Amino acid sequence: ALFADPDISFYNRKGELYPLSLIDSDRTKKHTFVKAPTGAGKTDFLIKRCRGRIFYTLPFQASINAMYERILHDLGDHVEDIRLLHSISQLLIGEERITEKVIQDKFGASIKVLTPHQLASIAFGIRGYESVLFDLQGCDIILDEIHTYSDIMQAIVLKMIEVLNHVGCRIHVGTATIPSALEKEILEILGKEQVQYVQLSDEVLTLFNRHEIYKAEAFTDLLPVLQQAVEQEKKILIVCNRVANAQVIFERIEELYPKTKKMLIHSRFKRGDRNRLEKELKNEYNVSPYACIVVATQVVEVSLDISFDLMITETAPIDALIQRFGRINRKRTAETIGKYKPIYIIAPPQKDSDCLPYNPEVLRDSFKVLPDGGELLRETELQSLINQVYPKTEKLDIDLDAVFVDGKWRLKELWHLSKSALIEKLDIDSVVCITQEDDESGKYREADKEERILMEIPVRYSSLRWKKLKQLDVGSHPFVVPDIAYSSERGLDLAKTGAENYDTNYQIW
């Protein structure tokens, strides 16, 4: 049934280990703001607050996949129309023209799980935004993990909140951590008196302390720690900020521990391989009684429900680090409360250019404010650490492009901005590639849309721009990379993607 409200009574369940489940939904308040650590029952609480059709937004592909599975598992028998929206803006970049295909499907579903980029059209009046708004008005919009967005995306999310509020949506914001300045702005837009504001008491927060922090100058300093952890059959997670670093470290691990179960996971895999790796990570590594090592990038920060014993990580912005730490000692049971596990943080690089994709100053400040020497990271102090690193939110002015300014729509009805300002703002220059084999064998051309998606490797256009690669005119217009540049264990190696590495032995028809 289109436009049917879902039956979400399942989420009224209560459990002592999930303090948020013990708090009742205040029906007199239209909106919600929940600030609580991972594992406190945030998802259940946000859904419990909904009264109509639900749009559940999360920042990353991996997280929307995981959330979709979870809701399907929880509500499968009660709700017939739960939909997953993959990246809606399939950008076709060719002849320097950027076109945006807004996929207007899955209209009127009871529950949709998606990324906020897919709703951003309403802040910018990109083609198709009227029907998106029509679908959204009067619904419940959950904006979860809101702390993980970049500055620009935060500005866009604020604008979206303003528009959604204007069209009668109930807005439910969930976050583990958030700079106070940003929280204040959100509450101002929604109107404090309209918001059920929920955070845990210091007493309860103390039960969420789970990590002891150690600092190190370089990865090599931690090799003895790694050795000991492997001997003790620990599950080890190593997190890097860049794919190339992760690939280098994975090679070291392969040399050092040829017999230990290990995996590399990052964004530059064929989507089919990435899905397989995510499943293995959850179903095999996560439950392994023996030593295993997973080397990853930011893809593990959010919503991959894994719980390891020890982490070695490069310094990231403090809010992202707190997310990362959530993958260690995550499972809360009566036994694990009060038991702590170690996290080792590697100092940020000296050179600013090596700090990319992050701001060097933010990295240095984040490293500085964290404890050291095995000291406990206290949940009650996280807010002050974050405020030290981000004393104020930098306001980005997106009103120039926005369609909705000061409570008024700026566009004439059904007229849209011809070129999406959003793409330039978000610097979404994501394109896909496929391997030479998937091209030459005709596999990609003959495949249907779903099969094609599984062959595609997402990359940034800027990293392929000068490589003179062949580009197909079908599907997502993928670039073709040499077979030698890809392996199902390591993903895409950008250093080998030049056209000079094409295999010329494929039969020329």
Language-model segments: which ranges?
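Conserved strand-helix element at the start of the C-terminal RecA-like helicase core
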Residues: R53-I64, A229-E254, L264
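Conserved Walker A/P-loop ATP-binding site and its immediately adjacent core
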Residues: R51-D74, H86-S89, S180-E183
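Walker A/P-loop
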Residues: T28-R49
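Conserved helicase motor
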Residues: L84-E95, V243-A244, M263-E278, T297-E301
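C-terminal helicase lobe and adjacent C-terminal extensions/tails of nucleic-acid helicase motors
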Residues: E183, E231, V248-N283, T313-W509
